[in-house]
């Protein structure tokens, strides 16, 4: 040990950083020896007592040096949290604050052990160590403070929630860290370390309380001050970078850990300004001056740049003369045409890259200093690591010059420069990460006010290109920084569909100003141009993946139907070659991008044409670089083979993308990529699982959005789904089931009554039967019974529910029974997802014509649904309520089609159970309630007189109607209220119910009249007015007072039909007035003599306003023959109501020439005159 101690004496510390000897000079220690030594040092420390003697100082100084000199590694047995805390606490107990040299050494030990061994101090020991450190800052000389702050930063790391006791001393108005963070601080090192401590304090730990608001704002202001300081008083560039990094990390922690109110404090513009500034920190050739605050505006932000020298004219000499090579192409012999055309393609793309890079220059002289991405790998020739010599742009040639061995500075200087560039890149990454957290902490509508500050736009004539996130993506030398910028851009684009929907450049109308729609359109075009350029220029596979993902996000949100066509074609043609890239993630993201195009824009003619491109175009140039390698040739031969051997030859509307995805999913690989991911099985080499999964998702998108094209591959896609469901990979099985569901749904959608697909272009019923026979004789039944994979069972249930009803009825009897048996069995599953899916599937099957008239199936389904309605899972109850609504719909259809025979055959006890279950469900959550009230309306409509007279039904009827009334008047969603009003209308249709006489009549009418007058949602008002017009006899409206209340409520509702706070509701006001007028005329046609005085009073008081609305309703301002017919129908309704009122004139004691008759006859006369004039 003596020799070891002598060696350790040579170690020293400077500014809290251990300057140790090389590890090669130290003897190899095993972990056990380190643990023994550590325990021995602890025992020595525990044997000492605090003293001020020279011998004590010497001994403890030696012990501390020995501890600091050890090369500890995390995870060593015997050196854990308990041992480290024990040795630190003991060392602090022994050292007194007047022993400043030892205080510094102890702090170095704290920092070293906590960082080296990655230990988080427990709360009790933390309390002691914090007290020691804070006292040291108060009592010791300033030369020790740097080491103390080092220790403090290590102590508070991830311990902010445990430091509440000391926060006021550290972060209060006169706190130690606050005072040290003053930019005028004479020692900039202390400023840097204080910011470091603050940043570590701000780190949030999930599940623990965060800093209080005052402390958060104190930290935020200090971090912002650091970032706003023009040039910190620190000579060392690396130290400046660490200061900036800590400030950025601190703000990021504040944004991630708490909802800091940037808008309320007015700090958002200031924060965004400094973030934009440091996104470009140290980027060669760029010196940007930012305003202190960015303001939200659709216009370009102020962008100050340092003046630069004009570019030397000889730079143009380096431009390759592509046109000469093009002219030479025609002189080549025929045998060399293939290679020459390929060379032409390279030249064209190189020229485009050069042209675009020139546009991206920030200033004329920056190219001389630009460390651009460097020589990039061309997708044209995967066997080359870089573009050919003649194809370098001037920027790349300069890059080669700067990085050559002829550099003007020495190796040591170069190493330092590289280190500085590395730290500057970390600052840029920190600014981008902080910006990403800022985006997540503010509303998108606020963020889009700053769109022009961060998203590129096409520059005006003569003006330079403004800096943006794409500047970093194209010009930063660090792949990680480029990826960060693209991540931020993706976050901005995510959810931007509504904001970008106003973009429009399809019409070339010249204006005196540039509207927002044109500005956004040009921004979208510039984004496409820059991202496509970045794809060609990128050399890092990881960053390339991020570019393609960002492009997919843009495609998902851009309104291409309002933009000039061609953008998607360029994206499509440029991304196709990357489907065969050697990197798995690049291939996956390329498929994701194609899927985004298909999902979001499939209806565009441009996309339809792209999907119908011939297969051979995949290997030809389509305006972008196209790789050519053995793997691509293999895929093309497989595609052609599939075309010749499969069903593809019969396809009237072929789609190369479907063929490609089928190939990627099911065809084995003949040779392997250099992928990091292993193959699926050792025997058969398939594409890596992520590629196959993405290909399946693209197939599902194609089937969903472009079924008219996919239906040509129906049987083949069914085979693909079956093959996937038979594999061992659970994810592949699941996506196979989802593809199957989309295929089934596509067939069903085609056959709907409102489908616009011509009958001759629909999938024939016999083909649908063949398809489902194949599926049911395949892996679907096994998937439904796979209890080890409940997610697959769920998807299989959803797939089974997508059977076409007409196809189901034509399936063999045993297959039908199999489907029903499996679904009824899965209804008892213990997994809520499976149970919910089975309940929903039964709700679909109950509407099948061949099943809904089967009383036994209806009864079995009802019992299964009733069981699910009492499940603990809200999702299961919601699906069960939906299915119950469908089941009761089928009861009404059967009642109308089969008459009383079906009602008598259906079990009274089961009907009563359903009534009670629906009543209880109407008190559940809104998702359950909306369908429960729908079921109640149907059940009350279904009841017959012999049901109603039974005592056990009387109570249930009254409770059910009370539940509907409560729902109408309750605070549920508008969908719930709408369904409840609809349900009450259904109740009124049942003539067997004692409407008008029962005690619940008044409550039902009161609920509807309340809603028709005051509900904010006009659709609910319309449905309530419709319900009020359903009763067909005067007796059903109850007493004269009840009748007149309904009449007055409708008149009031008519007058308020244009009163709304929500502009979106205004479009329904015309429909509302029509429905109210119809209800008023219906009431008038049923009025009794006792009702007339109230009606007359209303007409005298509000007659003028009512007249205009009724006149408009009857004449129906629609042109053409249809308006004549509609006018005649409505006119007849009013005429019948007038005749009904006129009948009272002949009664004894009645007034002749009733006001009501004259009033409405005048309306009819006015209508007739106006219609005759049409």
From Swiss-Prot:
Disulfide links within the chain: none
Ranges annotated as biased composition (Basic residues): 323-335
Organism taxonomic ancestry: Eukaryota, Metazoa, Chordata, Craniata, Vertebrata
Repeat recorded as keyword: yes
Presence of keyword Transferase: no
Protein's gene: heatr6
Region (Disordered): 304-346, 373-392, 619-648
Record's keyword terms, sorted: Repeat
Intervals holding HEAT repeats: 168-207, 460-498, 523-560, 566-603
Name of the protein: HEAT repeat-containing protein 6
Entry-linked InterPro entries: ARM-like (IPR011989), ARM-type_fold (IPR016024), DUF4042 (IPR025283), HEAT6 (IPR052107)
Pfam families in the record: DUF4042, HEAT_EZ
Organism per entry: Xenopus laevis
Feature: compositional bias, Basic and acidic residues: 336-346, 631-648
């Amino acid at each position: 040990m003596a020799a070891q101690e002598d060696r350790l004496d040579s170690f020293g510390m400077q500014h809290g950083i251990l300057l140790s000897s090389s590890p090669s000079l130290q003897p190899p220690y095993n972990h056990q020896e380190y643990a023994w030594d550590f325990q021995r040092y602890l025992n020595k420390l525990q044997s000492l007592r605090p003293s001020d003697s020279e011998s004590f100082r010497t001994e403890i100084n030696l012990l501390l040096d020995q501890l600091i000199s050890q090369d500890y590694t995390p995870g060593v047995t015997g050196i854990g949290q308990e041992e480290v805390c024990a040795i630190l606490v003991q060392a602090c107990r022994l050292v007194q604050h007047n022993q400043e040299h030892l205080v510094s050494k102890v702090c170095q030990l704290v920092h070293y052990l906590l960082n080296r061994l990655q230990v988080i101090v427990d709360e009790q020991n933390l309390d002691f160590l914090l007290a020691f450190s804070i006292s040291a800052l108060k009592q010791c000389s300033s030369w020790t403070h740097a080491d103390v702050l080092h220790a403090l930063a290590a102590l508070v790391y991830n311990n902010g929630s445990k430091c509440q006791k000391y926060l006021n001393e550290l972060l209060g108005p006169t706190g130690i860290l606050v005072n040290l963070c003053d930019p005028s601080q004479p020692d900039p090192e202390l400023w840097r370390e204080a910011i470091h401590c603050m940043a570590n304090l701000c780190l949030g730990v999930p599940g623990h309380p965060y800093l209080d608001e005052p402390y958060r704002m104190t930290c935020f202001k200090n971090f912002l001050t650091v970032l706003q300081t023009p040039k910190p008083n620190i000579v060392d560039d690396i130290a400046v970078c660490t200061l900036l990094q800590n400030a950025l990390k601190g703000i990021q922690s504040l944004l991630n850990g708490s909802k800091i109110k940037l808008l309320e404090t007015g700090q958002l513009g200031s924060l965004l300004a400094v973030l934009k500034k440091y996104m470009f920190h140290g980027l060669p050739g760029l010196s940007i001056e930012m305003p202190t605050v960015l303001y939200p505006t659709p216009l370009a932000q102020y962008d100050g740049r340092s003046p630069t020298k004009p570019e030397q004219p000889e730079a143009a000499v380096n431009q390759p003369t592509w046109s000469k090579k093009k002219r030479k192409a025609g002189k080549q012999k025929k045998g060399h045409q293939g290679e020459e055309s390929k060379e032409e393609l390279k030249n064209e793309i190189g020229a485009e890259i050069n042209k675009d890079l020139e546009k991206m220059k920030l200033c004329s002289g920056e190219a001389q200093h630009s460390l651009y991405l460097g020589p990039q790998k061309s997708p044209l020739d995967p066997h080359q690591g870089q573009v050919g010599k003649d194809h370098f742009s001037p920027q790349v040639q300069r890059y080669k010059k700067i990085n050559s061995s002829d550099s003007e500075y020495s190796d040591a200087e170069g190493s330092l420069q590289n280190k500085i560039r590395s730290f500057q890149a970390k600052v840029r990454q920190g600014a981008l990460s902080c910006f990403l957290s800022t985006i997540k902490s503010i509303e998108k509508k606020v963020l889009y006010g700053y769109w022009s500050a961060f998203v590129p736009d096409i520059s005006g004539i003569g003006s330079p290109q403004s800096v943006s996130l794409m500047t970093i993506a194209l010009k930063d030398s660090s792949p990680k920084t480029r990826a960060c910028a693209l991540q931020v851009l993706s976050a901005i684009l995510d959810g931007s569909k509504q904001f970008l929907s106003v973009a429009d450049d399809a019409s070339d109308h010249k204006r005196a100003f540039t509207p927002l729609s044109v500005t956004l359109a040009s921004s979208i075009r510039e984004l496409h141009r820059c991202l496509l350029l970045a794809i060609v220029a990128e050399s890092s596979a990881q960053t390339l993946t991020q570019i393609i993902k960002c492009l997919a996000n843009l495609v998902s949100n851009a309104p291409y139907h309002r933009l000039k066509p061609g953008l998607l074609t360029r994206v499509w043609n440029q991304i196709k070659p990357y489907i065969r890239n050697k990197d798995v993630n690049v291939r996956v993201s390329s498929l994701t991008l194609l899927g985004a195009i298909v999902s979001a824009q499939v209806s565009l003619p441009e996309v339809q044409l792209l999907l119908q491109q011939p297969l051979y175009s995949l290997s030809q140039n389509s305006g972008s670089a196209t790789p050519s390698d053995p793997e691509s040739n293999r895929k093309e031969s497989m595609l052609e083979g599939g075309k010749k051997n499969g069903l593809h030859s019969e396809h009237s509307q072929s789609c190369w993308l479907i063929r490609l995805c089928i190939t990627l999913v099911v065809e084995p690989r003949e040779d392997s990529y250099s992928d990091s991911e292993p193959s699926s099985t050792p025997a058969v080499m398939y594409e890596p699982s992520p590629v196959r999964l993405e290909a399946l998702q693209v197939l599902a998108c194609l089937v969903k959005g472009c079924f008219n094209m996919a239906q040509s591959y129906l049987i083949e896609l069914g085979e693909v789904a079956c093959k996937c469901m038979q594999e061992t990979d659970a994810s592949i099985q699941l996506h196979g089931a989802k593809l199957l569901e989309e295929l089934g749904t596509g067939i069903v959608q085609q056959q709907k009554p409102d489908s616009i697909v011509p009958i001759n272009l629909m999938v024939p019923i016999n083909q649908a039967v063949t398809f489902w026979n194949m599926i049911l004789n395949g892996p679907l039944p096994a998937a439904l019974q796979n209890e080890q994979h409940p997610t697959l069972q769920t998807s299989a249930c959803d797939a089974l529910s997508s059977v076409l009803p007409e196809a189901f009825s034509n399936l063999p009897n045993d297959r039908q029974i199999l489907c029903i048996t499996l679904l009824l069995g899965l209804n008892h599953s213990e997994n809520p997802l499976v149970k919910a899916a089975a309940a929903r599937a039964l709700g679909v099957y109950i509407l099948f014509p061949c099943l809904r008239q089967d009383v036994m199936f209806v009864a079995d389904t009802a019992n299964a649904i009733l069981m699910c309605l009492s499940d603990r899972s809200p999702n299961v109850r919601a699906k069960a309520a939906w299915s119950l609504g469908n089941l009761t719909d089928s009861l009404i259809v059967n009642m109308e089609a089969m008459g009383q025979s079906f009602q008598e055959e259906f079990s009274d006890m089961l009907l009563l159970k359903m009534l009670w279950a629906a009543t209880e469900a109407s008190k559940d959550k809104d998702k359950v309630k909306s369908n429960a009230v729908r079921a109640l309306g149907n059940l009350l409509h279904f009841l017959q007189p012999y049901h109603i007279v039974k005592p056990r039904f009387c109570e249930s009827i009254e409770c059910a109607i009370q539940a509907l009334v409560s729902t109408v008047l309750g605070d549920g969603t508008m969908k719930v209220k709408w369904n409840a009003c609809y349900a009450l209308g259904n109740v009124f249709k049942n003539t067997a119910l004692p409407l008008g006489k029962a005690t619940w009549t008044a409550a039902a009418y009161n609920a509807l009249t309340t809603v028709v007058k005051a509900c904010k949602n006009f659709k609910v008002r319309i449905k309530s007015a419709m319900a009020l017009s359903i009763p067909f006899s005067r007796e059903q409206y109850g007493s004269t007072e009840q009748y007149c209340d309904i009449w007055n409520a409708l008149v009031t509702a008519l007058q308020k039909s244009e009163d709304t706070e929500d502009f979106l509701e205004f479009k329904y006001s015309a429909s509302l007035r029509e429905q109210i007028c119809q209800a008023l005329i219906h009431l008038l046609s049923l009025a009794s003599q006792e009702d007339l005085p109230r009606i007359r009073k209303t007409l005298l008081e509000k007659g003028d306003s009512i007249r205009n609305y009724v006149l408009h309703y009857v004449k129906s301002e629609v042109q053409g023959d249809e308006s004549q017919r509609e006018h005649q129908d409505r006119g007849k309704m009013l005429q019948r109501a007038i005749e009904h009122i006129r009948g009272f004139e002949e009664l004894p004691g009645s007034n002749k020439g009733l006001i009501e008759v004259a009033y409405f006859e005048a309306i009819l006369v006015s209508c007739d005159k106006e219609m005759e004039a049409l």
